[in-house]
Amino acid sequence: MGISRFSSLLVFIFLTTGCYIDKYTEYKESFFSIYLKEWNSTICPKKIAFEKYVKNSNFKELIESNSDFEIKGCEKTESEFNQRIFTPNTFYIGEINYDIKLIIDDSLEFKITNIQNKLDTVAEKAGPKKWIIMNNINSLIVNGYELDNTKTPLNIWIPTKLGKIIRK
């Protein structure tokens, strides 16, 4: 009696889980947003400069500059998260094979180098046999500090305290 119940249970599990078809979703974006964690200020940034440089050029060979970002995290309802979120209005596509300089309000600078990223397939949390193909940012160096970025592979998370204050 017990063996037939066990066999029935195995057949049921096989039929319900074996019927799913693998579903793949591909994101082509290099990253979705840049998070500056531990902002510790009520000041909301007004301006961002996102500059792409030739990799390992010591920030001397500019490829492109962009200031078209949406800035979030300033509202009182979001203040409990103590962060600012910068999302490009025009997304960057593909693996990141360049260095980045991020300048906030002409006063705070982040030099981002050695970005370790690759195209990878990860399981989607929404259900079985659902997969996401995306660019995973595993680690990066910000102003000389190596950061592990594996917990947020589609975003760039940076502690604000790593920013260099620009003297005028």
What do the predicted segments below correspond to?
Residues Y35-I43:
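Structural motif
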Residues D22-K23:
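Signal peptide cleavage region of secreted peptide precursors
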Residues E26-S33:
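Contiguous beta-strand segments within globular domains
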Residues G2-L10:
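Sec-dependent signal peptide recognition
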Residues C44-I48, Y98:
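Short beta-strand/loop motifs in extracellular/secreted proteins, especially
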